[in-house]
């Protein structure tokens, strides 16, 4: 597998890497995109954004619209894509995509097996359409802390819905 770590990335670098990783995939590929950073909501437009380090305080050309991210993800040839977004207003990422709204809790084993055969897009977010807790006093957000803890303590194959449920339950309990 290939890994690309972007720390404190600027708009152009972020966009170029997302495009590279979503466009240059084959049908057998799986892709994980993890974003931890600032997010914003443009209330008048009802649009969510990721804010790279060079983004201005008010909406500008350096705000990365969730719509663009959604389009890159939808058009990718990759079989499975998981996006984990730990930012304020991250719940806007998959709103209005036109896809089926499948709550993780409603999925059965049979439907999960069916999804394994199809092209899937899964988004885990640290919250809905609101600000999220930045830190619980540690080095990471409450969401990231539990995500890391769950992955480290797991010693077998973990389905995405189980990871989501574990992190979600913890965050709801402690936020």
State what each model feature region is.
Residues 1, 29-31, 121:
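Residue-level recognition of the N-termini of beta-strands and the immediately preceding loop/turn
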Residues 3, 81-175:
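Active-site-proximal C-terminal subdomain of hydrolase catalytic domains
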Residues 5-7:
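A structural preference for short, hydrophobic beta-strand core positions in alpha/beta folds
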Residues 9-36, 40-98, 155-166:
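Caspase-like (clan CD) cysteine peptidase catalytic core
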């Amino acid at each position: 597998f290939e890994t690309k770590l972007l720390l404190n990335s600027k708009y152009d670098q972020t966009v170029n890497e997302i495009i590279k990783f979503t466009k240059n995939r084959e049908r057998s590929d799986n892709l994980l995109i993890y974003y931890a950073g600032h997010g914003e909501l443009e209330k008048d437009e009802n649009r969510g954004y990721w804010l790279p380090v060079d983004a201005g305080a008010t909406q500008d050309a350096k705000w990365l619209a969730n719509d663009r991210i959604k389009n890159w993800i939808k058009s990718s040839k990759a079989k499975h894509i998981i996006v984990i977004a730990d930012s304020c207003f991250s719940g806007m990422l998959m709103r209005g995509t036109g896809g089926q709204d499948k709550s993780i809790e409603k999925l059965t084993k049979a439907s999960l097996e069916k999804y394994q055969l199809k092209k899937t897009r899964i988004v885990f977010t640290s919250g809905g359409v609101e600000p999220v807790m930045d830190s619980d006093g540690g080095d990471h957000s409450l969401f990231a802390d539990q995500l890391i803890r769950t992955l480290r303590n797991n010693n077998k194959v973990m389905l995405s819905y189980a990871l989501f449920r574990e992190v979600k339950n913890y965050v709801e309990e402690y936020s």
